[in-house]
Amino acid sequence: MATLPRAAAAAAPSPAAALLPLPRAAPLLAGRAAARSAARRLRARGTRAPPLAAARRGWGGVSPRAVLDLPRRREAAEKPAQKAADLNEILSERGACGVGFVANLKNEPSFNIVRDALVALGCMEHRGGCGADNDSGDGSGLMSGIPWDLFNDWANKQGLAPLDRTNTGVGMVFLPQDENSMEEAKAVVAKVFTDEGLEVLGWRTVPFNVSVVGRYAKETMPNIQQIFVKVAKEDNADDIERELYICRKLIERATKSASWADELYFCSLSSRTIVYKGMLRSEILGQFYLDLQNELYKSPFAIYHRRYSTNTSPRWPLAQPMRLLGHNGEINTIQGNLNWMRSREATLQSPVWRGREHEIRPFGDPKASDSANLDSTAELLLRSGRSPAEAMMILVPEAYKNHPTLSIKYPEVIDFYDYYKGQMEAWDGPALLLFSDGRTVGACLDRNGLRPARYWRTSDDFVYVASEVGVIPMDESKVVMKGRLGPGMMITVDLQTGQVLENTEVKKSVASANPYGSWLQQSTRSIKPVNFQSSVAMDNETVLRHQQAFGYSSEDVQMVIETMASQGKEPTFCMGDDIPLAVLSQKPHMLFDYFKQRFAQVTNPAIDPLREGLVMSLEVNIGKRRNILEVGPENADQVTLSSPVLNEGELESLLNDSKLKPKVLSTYFDIRKGLDGSLDKAIKVLCDEADAAVRNGSQLLVLSDRSEALEPTRPAIPILLAVGAIHQHLIQNGLRMSASIVADTAQCFSTHQFACLIGYGASAICPYLALETCRQWRLSNKTVNLMRNGKMPTVTIEQAQRNFIKAVKSGLLKILSKMGISLLSSYCGAQIFEIYGLGQEVVDLAFCGSVSKIGGLTLDELGRETLSFWVKAFSEDTAKRLENFGFIQSRPGGEYHANNPEMSKLLHKAVREKSDNAYTVYQQHLASRPVNVLRDLLELKSDRAPIPIGKVEPATSIVERFCTGGMSLGAISRETHEAIAIAMNRIGGKSNSGEGGEDPIRWSPLADVEDGYSPTLPHLKGLQNGDTATSAIKQVASGRFGVTPTFLVNAEQIEIKIAQGAKPGEGGQLPGKKVSAYIARLRNSKPGVPLISPPPHHDIYSIEDLAQLIYDLHQINPKAKVSVKLVAEAGIGTVASGVSKGNADIIQISGHDGGTGASPISSIKHAGGPWELGLSETHQTLIQNGLRERVVLRVDGGFRSGLDVLMAAAMGADEYGFGSVAMIATGCVMARICHTNNCPVGVASQREELRARFPGVPGDLVNYFLFVAEEVRATLAQLGFEKLDDIIGRTDILKAKHVSLAKTQHIDLKYLLSSAGLPKWSSSQIRSQDVHSNGPVLDETILADPDISDAIENEKEVSKTFQIYNVDRAVCGRVAGVIAKKYGDTGFAGQLNITFTGSAGQSFGCFLTPGMNIRLVGEANDYVGKGMAGGELVVVPVEKTGFVPEDAAIVGNTCLYGATGGQVFVRGKTGERFAVRNSLGQAVVEGTGDHCCEYMTGGCVVVLGKVGRNVAAGMTGGLAYILDEDDTLVPKVNKEIVKMQRVNAPAGQMQLKGLIEAYVEKTGSEKGATILREWEAYLPLFWQLVPPSEEDSPEACAEFERVLAKQATTVQSAK
């Protein structure tokens, strides 16, 4: 085969940075190769590459690729009282990274190990982030053993005695920049050591090269020194480490009040390990720290870390590794973890501390990152006598339930986890953790396996772990083992014994240390299930009074409780939440309505609670949580509940448990002396009662508003306020671990309310009034008659209550999963909410640490709102039925809905008549509405004189900033979708395809229109020649439906939908009844088959993953801008910073009030935040971090007028999205039945007869947007501005409006009115800048080859070979884009045979088209074959290896994601989620991780080896064949949809054998060849997984021919 010069060079440059001067024997490659390599490094950072000459700066002309390509030869090593956690502070630091370690099993220190770690670090630069200067890294670092040779050399030169390795501690210290402060800090440090009896041997200034540091990092760079101390009073190694730990804690306490306290930081203080780190790019770490270039720096291991932080403000201490851990991930439950650790401070004791526990507090720091706090807790356990592996198992447990291997082979491991489940809440979230105490080095993965981790071992006794393969040059013949860490797995290297322990070996060793199983049997008890009550406990009048008093509405009962009782699931609704925020409403609201659920986006993924429930649990333990530092049977003395939702009998069981000593606290307050101050006083009394009860030994506090008879002057305290206040009070007084809180309440009936109570401290809830309402409903005459007449499914009274609780539990799992949290025990007290409308007084009392940006109600005002419900139950004219507040459905006299019938009618009149007067009436209607959104509290102002409107930019310019929302073709009809697209194209705006692809017929302008009709689009009217129905914005959503190479290359912009305003953190499902033949064709599925979109993108589990997808999309379509859609919530600014650094062109902020075709009511009402706050935070954060000019800011959510546009512009938005109102202008009548497929005007229906009623024409929407633009122009003229550019980011033109709200006058708008400055560029300049580039890429080299370009242009066949490295990402994506643009997805008749050798970077072979035959000899990272539409992709290991290919992990996670065609053959194992959302791809592999074939809708997958758990979850189409040689497959398959059967159909046998034959031919697989040789023996060992849509296919139906013949006979007979 012909080979390009790049591939032919024996020492082609490698991307590991020129981290160190190369050994003299190494060839120095300069010139073009070095420059190209430098440019490649810059593009790996996600920035536009500068001129190559500039890129070469700091490299010294040395090619880094030479490092990887040098022949490697191992040589023998030379022997020689704190406040609660505050969400604002926590959210300011989020991150992700690339990590790894190198370890020598002989424990022989070597400079080569350090060198290899730095090389690997340089090869993961693309996994890190940089600041706005493109030079200051987010952080990188290295942990190693202490380089004693280096330090003794220094000691010798200083005239000091040699350092004693057994009792010398070394501290790596960041000191204040100011010289005087530094000396003061050093004096305090030295004094603490001296006072502790340690001898300070000296200080060493760490040598560094400041010239390589970026500007931002240099400005904040500390003085970096090392301190050496002698520990004379201890001789045990662990005691020495403990003494050094105590000293560090004492130093922190001694310097706490110093002005320079935040500038003093110990990176490490140990006699075993040391950490070098900083705000540096990975490639310059070794250049900055000159020690790392010194060959005397020798260590038997090294952990390395590259950070990608969403916060770009340089903070040197937050670089990693930390003192024990290197963490790639995010802890979702951090606020709760910190609060619980604070609660433990009073009870943590251990003999090893010799009574000095009080000196090492606190154990957490809210100002530090989640990684730093996890490290701190792990270090506490380690210094208290736990091993690193045990500490990790306690803090980050695996999903041990539903784990057949553990339950059968390792029950002691399950006992260990069950024991600690009640002692330590899991630190939950995606995490790859590397750890070392200097004796053990290891790595573990979170329970969901949401970070990549590969490992390999060599014959010369080295073990490597890394986020990616290919980061270190390797002689493959020496590799004896290749593997990957799966969910919850661990690997450790014992440096003292040379043992490598893999997963269950580690855990069995730890779990066998104590008899945890017998302790559990001895002390832990469970509540036995208690039957539900079978009769009502109250009469109808009493129930009604209770419902009125506690805030129920008829909607709550009929649409929520009764639906849950009858169906066992949450009610679904549609459109968005268009009512006022609770604090702005004139109607009374329950306290729960002031809280919005937070959710995962970008930095961590949501979870699918339906298809991945095996990793989730609602179990909770009740009782005292004792001393975590000691073990024993008494710690297991608790009660286990299977869920937090109790019926009356189960609550009674808890109350009868004498060991718990339960105390019931009444939650009423007395208003006989007036309301003012009464609620505050009652809360204080309640907290005092709780305090006394716990001090007297109570382990269970039951807060109850249950009463025999309600009293008019004794209203109930809002139960959420009571729970939160007691929870916070007990934390502050060190009592929280001593008791659990249970709520016995009438105030809880929706899943959101349960979640709030649990999130603020309740362990369980008994919703007695909701259960009574279920009983009353079931026994009502209306319900009985409906069931008797068959109009409602028959349920018993017990079943109604069981259904209700089932729905609550399902809803709780969904709420947890939105945030990526798996365990209710971790969610409890984690405060995963944002508050809208409560003042600081209320927040500090009960919700301390939660974000409440706009202030709001005082305690007295909250008391008045509570009382407004209560008095209705006792007034003389009390209604005989519950009031309908109209919170869900618009109704006369109910709550105001922005999308109301009158508004729709006025807008229809204006756009259909093209009447300025009618639009003015529409404007007046909006202006006269009640306060509905935050911007209604603001008005525009100007110190300029008005100008003639003729001087203002034209409407045609303004409308170019308008976009419509991403509405999928499937959720809405084809007519609506196309009419909107045509309208937006006419005005130069942009429509959005939504999920589901696009018909290619829409990509060409119409030229056949007569009288408004076109044969091309016969279902539309009002057309014009030249119209195009394409959507300028093509959406890439989690399901990847319709995402093909041709779809992407025909996009002007590509939107990555991370979240949707109406249901953030959730996926979706298009019901089978909406999947018509047309929809199925576009989505590469079958008609009538339900199509599931996962909650997360399965290639976006972190910020660096998002950067990779952005890279992939820029790769296939370098002309399309990439936008990322986020939903407003606290912390969105830091997320947006990360998105900007990830090379996005556009960031879209969506408000909570956006529309949806279908969503649970609780999500519509209680998730996401106002776009005003989200936009302000995003704009200001980007300005502060110097990133605003990089991205266009787009905002949407409830836009209806030009005033909305102007408000958004003043807050910083460049472009503006319209969703629901665009549908209304096109014909929507707001019937709010989108989710039923029964839209009366065919806007949101796939039913042909309803679609025929569609009234809209594109011109209506054109008219609307021109009206809005003219409104903008008129207002700009009044304000004295000539163009929108002039006001963007100008918050100074906003002022608070004088509005008298019904509930409070304490709304604080300063957050919206504050300014961080203006961008350096105008909005028009930002919008018109070029698409962000990936920089030089390997695909450009491929396309530059004349043979390949000729083959593409003239459809010929060509064969080529190229070298590939892990920094070569999305390889072949650009080539595929060129082919797709020219020939479409199936039109290329040529053939490109391209072979790569080496280790491929992420997304290898993405978006392949037919005619591309790609072969990789080596290995690959994650996302192989992503989005491929055709072609062939083969991955095989190198010919000479030291491992068995079928046992080795050859490719990474999430391969074949969203494939719509082609074949993949992998000789070896793949990672998690192989073939996730595969549509039509075929594949053969030799083993997979968990979740294989998840959400698959078509195609065929063959696995010739073992698979992980949860196979075929959500699989609605396609077939899978899995070889089950050891009879272990059955419990691993998710049988909710698919059925398992042997391969009996002849067509199925032919399909299976044919694929294996092709596989063997392409890969040379010995395993495959053996199967074919012994076909008759192996065939019975295969299982076929068949979803319902494939049951009648010839491959699955053994009697297909007979059935077909019978059907033919039946048809013939009928004739």
UniProtKB/Swiss-Prot annotation:
Its cofactor is [3Fe-4S] cluster; FAD; FMN. Pathway: Amino-acid biosynthesis; L-glutamate biosynthesis via GLT pathway; L-glutamate from 2-oxoglutarate and L-glutamine (ferredoxin route): step 1/1; Energy metabolism; nitrogen metabolism. It catalyses: 2 oxidized [2Fe-2S]-[ferredoxin] + 2 L-glutamate = L-glutamine + 2 reduced [2Fe-2S]-[ferredoxin] + 2-oxoglutarate + 2 H(+). GO terms for biological process: ammonia assimilation cycle; glutamate biosynthetic process; L-glutamate biosynthetic process. Residues 1-52 form a transit peptide. Its main location: plastid. Expressed in leaf blades and at lower levels in roots. GO terms for cellular component: chloroplast. [3Fe-4S] cluster binds at C1228, C1234, C1239. It is found in: Plastid, Chloroplast. It comes from the Eukaryota. Gene3D superfamilies: Aldolase class I, Glutamate synthase, alpha subunit, C-terminal domain, Glutamine Phosphoribosylpyrophosphate, subunit 1, domain 1. GO terms for molecular function: 3 iron, 4 sulfur cluster binding; glutamate synthase (ferredoxin) activity; glutamate synthase activity; metal ion binding. This is Ferredoxin-dependent glutamate synthase, chloroplastic.
